[in-house]
From Swiss-Prot:
Keywords: Ribonucleoprotein, Ribosomal protein, RNA-binding, rRNA-binding, tRNA-binding. This is Small ribosomal subunit protein uS7. GO terms for biological process: translation. One of the primary rRNA binding proteins, it binds directly to 16S rRNA where it nucleates assembly of the head domain of the 30S subunit. Is located at the subunit interface close to the decoding center, probably blocks exit of the E-site tRNA. GO terms for cellular component: small ribosomal subunit. It comes from the Bacteria. One of its GO terms (molecular function) is tRNA binding. InterPro entries: Ribosomal_uS7, Ribosomal_uS7_bac/org-type, Ribosomal_uS7_CS, Ribosomal_uS7_dom, Ribosomal_uS7_dom_sf. Belongs to the universal ribosomal protein uS7 family. Part of the 30S ribosomal subunit. Contacts proteins S9 and S11. The keyword Ribosomal protein applies.
Amino acid sequence: MSRRRVIGQAEILREPKFGNLDVAKFMNVVMLSGKKSIAESIVYGAFEAIQNKTGKDPIEIFSQALSNVKPMVEVKSRRVGGANYQVPVEVRPQRRAALAMRWIREAAKKRGEKSMAQRLANELVEASEGRGAAMKRRDEVHRMAEAHKAFSHFRF
């Protein structure tokens, strides 16, 4: 590990339409091969579909979905005396949001709807209501942490 100065986090510009930093980060998560305009059209298309489907503010739905999917604890492998233990650890806030965004994207990719914007819209609506594949993933991670609670004294 380097002993030199710590490198700062890259600044993410707010997206122009809503001025929301989380939406800008989510666009970067959706983006493939640097094609940001395509990622923007997917996310904005999903927001439009959410607006049409629910009649509510898409930013509210998005932030509700994000906060529902964010994991509180996860398990990390720790080797102690020749045995590997799955140790539950609390997730840092930045990683919490990153994991939630990734899980929503992956869940949307696996859905059956025609366009990615439609898949993303439906996944976001379901996640905001506490359903969907992304929520299932979060619950699975929480279950793993709960099952391995006995090893929590092997802190990092």
